[in-house]
Regions:
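Ligand-binding loop in jelly-roll beta-barrel domains
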Residues: 91-117
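Conserved short histidine dyad/triad with adjacent acidic residue
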Residues: 35-56
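A short, N-terminal "cap"/entry segment at the start of jelly-roll beta-barrel domains
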Residues: 1-37, 45
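Short beta-strand segments
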Residues: 34, 78-80, 105
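Short acidic-glycine-tyrosine-enriched beta hairpin
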Residues: 74-93
Length: 119
């Protein structure tokens, strides 16, 4: 029988910083869980494109927004805003940016393993 495992995001296994943001990552078994913080003025295509090396974000995100607002634009053209309390699924092939003057904090249940890493 397996034991219960606990980790705390206040003591992440890894913190990846990038212009105007960071992602704090904990790994538990096969799960990689992230808490991402994006400052006002953050935009994926301006802050992470050169780090990752792809034309748009190719990470799949399943997440929950704690605070702030983010606008997501898919490569195919559809757009959506997400904010506090929203649970979202965002497939690969998108740009995103912060809306307003409040930092956006979101938990990512699927994309933290590779987010903000060179493709």
């Amino acid at each position: 029988m397996a034991d219960t495992i606990k980790k705390n995001l206040n003591k992440p296994d890894e913190t990846r910083t990038f212009p105007k943001g960071k992602i704090e990552v904990v790994k538990i078994g096969d799960l990689t869980f992230g808490k991402a913080t994006f400052e006002p003025g953050w935009k994926w295509s301006e802050c992470l494109k050169s780090i990752v090396g792809t034309k748009s974000c190719m990470v799949n995100h399943n997440g929950y927004v704690v605070s702030g607002r983010m606008h997501i634009k898919m490569d195919a053209g559809s757009e959506i805003d997400i904010g506090p309390g929203d649970v979202f699924v965002c497939p690969p092939g998108h740009d995103a940016w912060i809306v307003g003057s409040e930092p956006c904090v979101a938990y990512d249940f699927t994309g933290a393993e590779t987010y903000a890493k060179k493709a």
